[in-house]
């Protein structure tokens, strides 16, 4: 179990590691996870993610993970969120935020987007909950970086006489996110395996407000971060989660922000998923995110939701990731808010729902 501190630091580019100097006395050996937004396109050929991973990994312990989400469209500002191990006991805080990180086994290209990936994610998340000593109800965020299918990987699957889940590299990002999110839902007991596999086939509606998955070409396993609250920790950090029902759902956000304010809390960071409503309309009005041949729909969605969340937060260094398959209701997205409370405030995490 790792009691946690969080530092959100702007970056000057994908290769910027200056955040190591902004950890309030913590060192690189204390880092559990680096979760960043980079200014690439967020698509298959976004090498800003690869660059960030390449410069950060040699600086971290082998047990630490990185998750870099490409796409800083609109007002989203590139940054890193660094979760560090903080075993200090803060008086006046009967509980606090805890995190655990891990990796699945290597996901074979023929397994991406399929039940094997769902199962691998489920098994790893369950193991991380056990490590933390928490139950599913204590968890506010499970954030995953998962692999995609490159052209070479697809060709290799065919050479072995197998079939990939898709031959479209961009679609493989969606399929991988979907399988990862359903593995999370299983681990948090939001569905059983039968329902998860039906949802994977598009025959059931399963989603989690605590799942956040993004995919990339820079890894062949899944990097996983679990964020929960625990009575075994004593720090000022808390978390709350909700789901936006669509890209305009400011009410879902303000309700959480208001409850945090009622606790005397201060918002530290927002982790959100966003997608273009697959129906082609939002609240009865047609949108063109899915029919724009110049800009991918995930980029439109990040810009729209990123602007909404940044306006509420007061700055653009917010973690908004595109593609919300099974991560919130269709057309919406999961949201987790991490905040801190003063020692004299109600520290029971009542903002959560």
UniProtKB/Swiss-Prot annotation:
Active site: 145, 214
Region: RU C, residue numbers: 237-353
One GO MF term: metal ion binding
Pathway: Xenobiotic degradation; atrazine degradation; biuret from cyanurate: step 1/1
Entry keyword set: Hydrolase, Magnesium, Metal-binding, Plasmid
Residues annotated to bind substrate: 49, 69-70, 177, 214-215, 302, 321-322
GO annotation (BP), single: atrazine catabolic process
Sites annotated Important for substrate specificity: 298
Reaction catalysis annotation: cyanurate + H2O = 1-carboxybiuret + H(+)
Protein family: Belongs to the cyclic amide hydrolase (CyAH) family.
Subunit structure: Homotetramer.
Protein name from the UniProt record: Cyanuric acid amidohydrolase
Organism whose genome encodes this protein: Rhodococcus sp
